[in-house]
Every structure is written in structure tokens, then in C-alpha cells.
Amino acid sequence: MINPTKVDVQIKEFSKEQLIDISKDIHKQGVAVFYNQKLNETEYTSVMKKFGECETPNLFMNPKEHPEIFLVTGKKVDGKKIGMFGDTELGWHSNGNSRHLIDKILIALYCVKEDINTTLSVCN
């Protein structure tokens, strides 16, 4: 079982060099959890770009202003899904379906609104 250390820091204040060091630790440990981050979409993508290049496939679940973000939600606007996956349990996962094309990958999740049903499981 992975038991990440709970550290109360704001990653948006880290330099690129500090984030690269963190990514090396993530590679060894398998996961890092940063609680209580106060990031808007621009700050989130700025931090992620310090780690490396972000994927921007421009699909329906990628906001036009921030195509690096993938919305994982069952929420609908005007009757249309705005994010990937279903209306109930989302069951979101990344199984590295394109890992054979790349030599490094980092997945970052940011929970905007947590509730009693919010669960994060990490398997490596």
C-alpha cells in the first residue's frame, strides 16, 4: 500500500528545478499527494509544464482555454457531457495505453470539488 506523506506546501511556488527533483522522487516512490492546493486552471497548467510537455489533443473534454486539462466528470451543460466517463461512478483510470510511444509519463489529478464519494486509488 502506498502511504504518501501529507505535506502542506503550495507547488505553484516551486521552481522548475524543485519540481524536477520531486518528479525523481515520484519515480522512486510511485506517487506524491499535495493537499489543499489553491490553483486555478492557468496556475495548474503552468505547474504541469514545469514537469514537461503536456498533451493537448483538443477533444470535447479539454477546455478550449486550457487544452492541457482533461475534465473527468459526469456533469452536463445544456444536456451535453463536458467531461469523459459516465454519469455515476466515473471509474477513471490511466493504464498507459500509449506508453510504448513515450519513455516518460506523469499523470496529475486535481480534485476541484471533493465529496463523500470521492475516492482515489493508486496502483503501480
Named regions from a protein language model:
Residues 1-124:
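Non-heme Fe(II) oxygenase catalytic core, chiefly the N-lobe of the double-stranded beta-helix
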